[in-house]
């Protein structure tokens, strides 16, 4: 199945209500970088201009600047990002203790259940992957650090949304845009609110083929020293690989144990900072 591009940037527009310190040219340059993603790794000048809302001439200037800085390469007709763009996010990721704390637990869980495991955080209306141990490829999209998916259609997203207070959840539901990614995807605020209530009762989430057909994912909350949900850990499997009874009896307990272990280590780290 082909999953829609969920990382496409918003078209850059003039922002008359912005702060006097707002730098429009910087916003435009960042939009060019964000135009590239898992579904658009190589793009023409016209593609970039269309994705960002910039003129071809303006998009070309930004692309040439990014080439000079080492963030973009070109063969004369197509443009693509270089690994150097990872530096832009590395300062933030390296400052987090979470990925370092989580990784050994993800590795242990992946070894135990023979499935891929991940940790993500909530950013706006998306989940963003900050740690991952891949075992087998299930999805058609390649998942790496920084990959984003819409929170409403993912197990990790629903766990993170369940950790919000009611006002924060209402704010999310008012601005989220629901799309039927598969025939199983929840597409209304009312349905999602009911799903989140179930997550809060159970302490974990199972999403069955809502982000991609054939993909079943489980997620549980990671909490900091104060008990606040700060991230989510998940494991993903093919929907046909396990009966739902096995999922509840074997995979869920293993996942909850991992979430608890990460939370404990994270709290210990924060206490000693």
Give residue ranges: language-model regions:
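Short, structured helix-loop boundary elements
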Residues: 22-26, 82, 95, 99, ...
